[in-house]
């Protein structure tokens, strides 16, 4: 959460650097979210040189602090009054194409004899990131130290101020606050409840300031800062998977990672506002997306945490089982108990439709189910790959898990069938072992293999399921598929059932 907040703060820092150069306010930001920004700057004398001057300073600072891990590209187009008022599509397309060109040569102005190799002043490496050099073994680099302080601050504060200081006048006033030093300017995180600091900031005057998760000064931004807490500390992922849901109710202690984002949002911005296009519509849509992912998402997570039969009350301070790793712009990454993540994906899709009330604006997702001991970064990467698989489906609005992609219109039905299967196992109508064996037989590659497996499956049901009604229901679910996609969906249902049950 904290490293991604750092990236978000750096995006804002870049944005405000241009505004500060031209003496502009936050009103000149058309949008600034999801790692990108669109600004309205004046076409005055020397404006190109001023843009390049700011870019050189910011890019040099980023390269010094983060090497090539974090940087940015920029471009601009000129608009007359009519083009600006109507926010013409051809200008948006031109700007996008110019940005794509810049991506292919983003370090071309920074390449010199020291770009590829530079002798370090020290030989010790940061204990946290393993890439930046430090003075002594066991120390953290400046960047990792900032991330650690951000983490401590986020755990203790839900509402805060983020001040951007280009003049340096707040170094003494805010010397005890968390500072992200960009060398050419400083960003400070401030406790909103510190009345004394608040008064000093207002009295001194400030360049730019943002209020996080409440309304106070400057722009209001919503950041989904939600993690499971116990005794004031963030629960480890092992505890999230093992202690927050009952094993009797939800089976294996697996961790789930959910990654989702809005389908075709770029196309919606470019072409979906074609009738009476305007900057205000563009800005409104951008802010509505940010509000959903930064504000409403927290309440969705809290709702699912309360609804699940869980141990969340006794094992957390804030009755929440989900760790929001990132949420902003039009996408999210959330970590939690696997069974909770399965339900959360359904609820986010449902809530997003209610929020937009537009069947043409959808969301897609990818889910990873993994052991809590596996590195989280690998799980997030897999969830991202699953999301990419969902994005390849015609019309999208899909979710991928367990190597299969399902349309989200069908996903709720899948979870309903899982609950039915779970009941059959919990009430001992069928053993978990027999159910697992049937699932293994059904895990086929084509419809012909499925048809060949039906006689054996019917025999297994006859031998192992004594209740005639339940046997008929299982026959109906298992032996009536007409396409391989339906078989794939059935196997996903059975795998999820196995995961969420225990052998008696």
Residue ranges and their predicted role:
Residues 1-504:
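Charged, helix-rich terminal subdomains or tails
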């Amino acid at each position: 959460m904290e490293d991604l907040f750092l990236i978000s703060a750096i995006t804002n820092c870049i944005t405000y650097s241009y505004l500060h150069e031209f003496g502009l306010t936050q009103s000149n930001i058309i949008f600034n979210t999801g790692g990108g920004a669109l600004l309205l700057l004046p076409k005055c004398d020397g404006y190109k040189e001023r843009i390049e001057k700011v870019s050189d300073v910011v890019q040099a600072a980023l390269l010094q602090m983060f090497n090539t891990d974090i940087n940015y590209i920029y471009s601009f187009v000129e608009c007359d009054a009519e083009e600006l008022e109507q926010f013409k599509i051809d200008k948006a397309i031109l700007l996008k194409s110019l940005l794509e060109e810049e991506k292919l040569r983003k370090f071309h102005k920074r390449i010199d004899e020291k770009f590829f190799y530079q002798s370090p002043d020290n030989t010790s490496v940061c204990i946290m990131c393993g890439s930046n050099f430090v003075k002594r073994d066991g120390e953290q680099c400046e960047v990792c130290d900032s991330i650690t302080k951000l983490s401590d601050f986020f755990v203790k504060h839900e509402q805060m101020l983020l001040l951007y200081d280009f003049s340096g006048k707040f170094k003494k006033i805010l010397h005890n606050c968390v500072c992200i030093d960009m060398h050419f300017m400083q960003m400070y995180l401030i406790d909103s409840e510190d009345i004394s600091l608040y008064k000093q900031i207002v009295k001194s005057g400030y360049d730019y300031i943002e209020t996080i998760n409440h309304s106070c000064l400057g722009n209001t931004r919503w950041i989904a800062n939600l993690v499971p807490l116990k005794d004031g500390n963030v629960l480890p992922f092992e505890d999230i998977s093992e202690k927050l849901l009952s094993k009797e109710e939800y089976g294996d202690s697996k961790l789930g990672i959910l990654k989702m984002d809005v389908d075709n949002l770029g196309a919606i911005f470019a072409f979906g506002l074609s009738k009476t296009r305007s900057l205000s519509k563009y800005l409104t849509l951008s802010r509505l997306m940010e509000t959903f992912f930064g504000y409403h998402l927290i309440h969705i997570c809290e709702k699912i945490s309360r609804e699940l039969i869980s141990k969340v009350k006794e094992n957390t301070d804030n009755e929440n089982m989900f760790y929001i790793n990132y949420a902003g712009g039009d996408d999210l990454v959330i970590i939690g108990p696997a069974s909770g993540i399965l339900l959360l994906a359904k609820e986010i899709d449902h809530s997003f439709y209610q929020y937009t009330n537009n069947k043409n604006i959808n969301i897609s997702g990818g889910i990873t189910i993994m052991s809590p001991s596996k590195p989280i970064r690998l799980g997030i990467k897999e969830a991202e790959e699953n999301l990419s698989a969902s994005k390849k489906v015609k019309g999208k609005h899909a979710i991928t898990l367990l190597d299969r992609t399902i349309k989200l219109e069908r996903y709720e039905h899948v979870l309903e069938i899982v609950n039915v299967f779970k009941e059959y196992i919990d009430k001992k109508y069928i053993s978990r072992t027999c159910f697992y064996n049937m699932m293994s037989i059904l895990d086929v590659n084509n419809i012909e293999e499925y048809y060949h497996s039906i006689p054996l499956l019917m025999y297994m049901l006859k031998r192992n399921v004594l209740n005639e009604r339940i046997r008929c229901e299982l026959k109906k679910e298992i032996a009536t598929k007409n396409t391989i996609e339906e078989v794939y969906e059935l196997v996903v249902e059975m795998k999820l059932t196995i995961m969420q049950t225990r052998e008696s």
